Amino acid sequence: LLKHILQYIVFLALLCMAVCLLVSVRIRRSSIQTGIYGGQKRRGKQWGRNFMLGVQFFICWIFVTLTVSLFLQSGKVTETLFHTLSQEDKETILSIPLDYPFLENKEKQEMVERFRQHVGVKDILLSDISYTHGISGNLLMTEKGNDNSWIDINVMCVPLNFFTFMNIPITEGRTIRTKKDLVMDEVWQKRQKKDIIGMNFYDQTSDFTVCGVCAPFQTDVHNHNGGYAFTLYDSSEYIGHCYVKCYPEQQKEVMKWMETIRREVLPENISSQVRTFQDDLYEVQAVEYILKDIISFFAIVSIIITLLGVYSSITLD
């Protein structure tokens, strides 16, 4: 879609240049009296002016249509990404990066414990990576020690409270409890066309057994989603990101509290500003939002030019 939009913009720009060139040539060859009152042969038949006005309406219609389609698309994508969370949830969850090499994991844990002390904090979710910027792995084996049995699947290491925090329902079986448990989402299950509860999978160091199936987990709309596998995450080894769910009425106070803690712990050259989960999603859709703003600007300009053209036509008549 983005490629097609860019092609439309280039086409419209070339069309506008061609129209402007033709109008300029026409004006240079016409006298002022002829331009205002029309020649004897064409008086009362302002086909040229009407044609130009039609072109203006056409260009205006294209830009307005593109603007509406981009607004609808961006809204649909926002709803699709992490669709188990409501819009309010996305706006009240704070996203805090902790992947700083100069911090020991113990220091990160102490920072998280200080986060918990605020009464406005409802729950905290720890992760090894930001959910909008990657996954924990992408391969599992169906046969132990068989390098030819690797399958391509998105692997996420998640803590025990992941499914409740993200509002992801378990549709079959149960959630993860130990490091040997594995939960698959429905996307991967449908690809197998069979019951996967009890199936065994392996990586280089561990073996897993599927204990449950959850609702689809959607983190990207541009790339093919082959399904997700969820294993237990151990935050004592490494913390790369922290998500904090707040009570809506206390979100601003929680943000100030966490920004104060970050200023105390982090160096001055690192921003202490705290973002929301919705801000992370906007960053993922940055290109779409930029295009939407550009097309919206051109749509407004084309509407103004079209209205001026209609006004001038009425005035001349």
Would you name each region that the model predicts?
Residues 1-99:
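Alpha-helical transmembrane segments of integral membrane proteins
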Residues 105-107, 112-123, 186-193, 203-292:
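"Rare, low-scoring activations can occur
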Residues 90-96, 180, 238-242:
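Short amphipathic alpha-helical segments
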